[in-house]
């Protein structure tokens, strides 16, 4: 998701891991989403591995949501340049099991591996190992996806907005009981007097 031809996106790390992965998971398919020129990556790849990689191009928000809900795992092999990792939050929210490099932003978001599997950044062998383990263990993959999806709800804007609103409301109104329904809010009762 994003310009895959930018080195910091780490697509080369994933491509370098593919020969190892395909030895253990011969049916593996890699879908690459985002704008960029796929020929740049395909030219140096073993022809037998090329048919395992499909470049989808840039996805609309709707297509991105469908994508996240349909994959066995979302791989983020980024090598740096991320301050939060919104794409990981989107993948988690979509119910995908996440495998990501251990760059600080991803490690923090995934809480050191609690909500997604981490691999050593720029280490294609470690990436291959983590992907193979995760895809071979459907129970772990499903559990990781479920826990990640639950965790991602805290990043939903309606929930974040509601929590911010409650903080302001408590600061303004004081000790009044805070509810989730607008009609029960202390400020609303005062406003409607």
Language-model regions, residue ranges each:
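Short acidic alpha-helix that forms the nucleotide-activated donor recognition element
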Residues: 60-71, 93, 107, 111
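A conserved mid-protein helix/loop that constitutes part of the nucleotide-sugar donor-binding site
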Residues: 5-20, 40, 125
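Conserved acidic donor-binding segment of nucleotide-sugar-dependent glycosyltransferases
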Residues: 112-113, 117-124, 133-139, 153
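Nucleotide-activated donor-binding/catalytic signature segment of Leloir-type glycosyltransferases, i.e.
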Residues: 41-62, 73
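A charged, aromatic-enriched C-terminal amphipathic alpha-helix characteristic of glycosyltransferases
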Residues: 139-176, 185
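Short Ser/Thr-rich beta->loop micro-motif in glycosyltransferases that lines
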Residues: 2-3, 76-80
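Short hydrophobic beta-strand element within catalytic cores of glycosyltransferases
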Residues: 97-100
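Glycosyltransferase donor-sugar binding loop
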Residues: 1-4, 29-42, 57
